[in-house]
Structure formats: C-alpha cells, structure tokens
C-alpha cells in the first residue's frame, strides 16, 4: 500500500464489501444499494476485485483467463495481491478520504476463501500479503450473499449465456462447496463486521435485507460519529 494513508474520523467515507460464491448476485445487489444510498444523498464509488483500477484490470484479465493458474497457487495469489495494492492506493483510499462510500464486489475475504481455503495457500503467506497490500484497512461492513452451490452455478451459467466459464466458474462442485463453507466460517468468525444473507429470494427481497443491514450497522455509526 506504499505511503497511502487512511483518514480517521467523521469525514471518512464507509467501506462496504460484498462477498459470496459464483452466481450469488453480488453485482446486482451492489447496484441496488448504490441507488438507494445516492437517493439519500450519499456519494458512492462502485468498484470490484480483481480489478477496479487500470493496473488491476490487467491483472484481472490474467487471472480470470486461467493464465495465473498455470503459475501455481502462490504465484496466482501474488497477482491478486498486486492488483489489490494498485486498487487500494488509486481507488479505494482516495474515495474514502474524500468522504465517499466505497462499495466493492469482493475484497480480501475472497482471497481467504478462494486461494486460502481452496487454493491451499498457507495462512501466514496470505496474512503477509494482506499486511503489505491493505495495511490496517478493513471493510466497515461485509455482506456475504449465500446461495446453494447448484443455484449459484445455474445463475452464473445463465448470466454468461454461450460464453465460456471463467477460471473459477470452471472448477468442480467440490471446490464451490468448499468456497461456501469458507464464507460461512468467515461470517461466523467476524460477526461484528460480516452479515450472512440468504440470497435465494428475489433481487428486491434481498435488496431490502441488505438495506436493513446497512442502516442498522452503518447509519447508526455515522450518526454517532457526527
């Protein structure tokens, strides 16, 4: 994260991350939350990982095309770390310091689940990469969208149509079930930061649950700080 620094205090924006397996509906829910926040006068920056900045988008292409997998699990994780470092320095921190709310489709919890739990990269390696790339930056709220693996993969297939599955969509069912378990464990381990949301309902119903969680967890905190 180099010399970038995160401001503290009431002028800082809020950082909300969306996590979950393939086809959980993260992209849809981020857009719906952004619309609601903007109607309330909140400045919002939408972003994603891997990607979100010009340099990180290059890394995204390398990873999702499958080229990173050819290098091995730890090397692939280094690509994610390089993308995150660029993304945090050039997009996330500047937006938060300017008072905007940052809504991010995936963050370090996905690295824990995908590369840690399923890629078998050692926890000490992941922790070292996390310290270097994000320092003490943590999401104010993480919304983990949960759907059964079969449902998520069906949604992902319908979304891409005739296109080929990406690097992670093409993994076997055991991999995806392991991912779901990993996200459940993250939610259970950090209940103050994470909210596990049943995302099998309609987009509108899930959006209402997301909105309730944001109001309860973050609007109260904003009011208390002001």
Swiss-Prot record:
ATP binds at residues 20-27. The keyword Acetylation does not apply. One of its GO terms (biological process) is dUDP biosynthetic process. Its EC number is 2.7.4.9. GO terms for cellular component: cytosol. Pfam families: Thymidylate_kin. One of its GO terms (molecular function) is ATP binding. InterPro entries: P-loop_NTPase, Thymidylate_kin-like_dom, Thymidylate_kin_CS, Thymidylate_kinase. Keywords: ATP-binding, Kinase, Nucleotide biosynthesis, Nucleotide-binding, Transferase. PROSITE patterns: THYMIDYLATE_KINASE. It catalyses: dTMP + ATP = dTDP + ADP. Belongs to the thymidylate kinase family. Phosphorylation of dTMP to form dTDP in both de novo and salvage pathways of dTTP synthesis. PANTHER family: THYMIDYLATE KINASE, UMP-CMP KINASE 2, MITOCHONDRIAL. HAMAP family: Thymidylate_kinase. This is Thymidylate kinase.
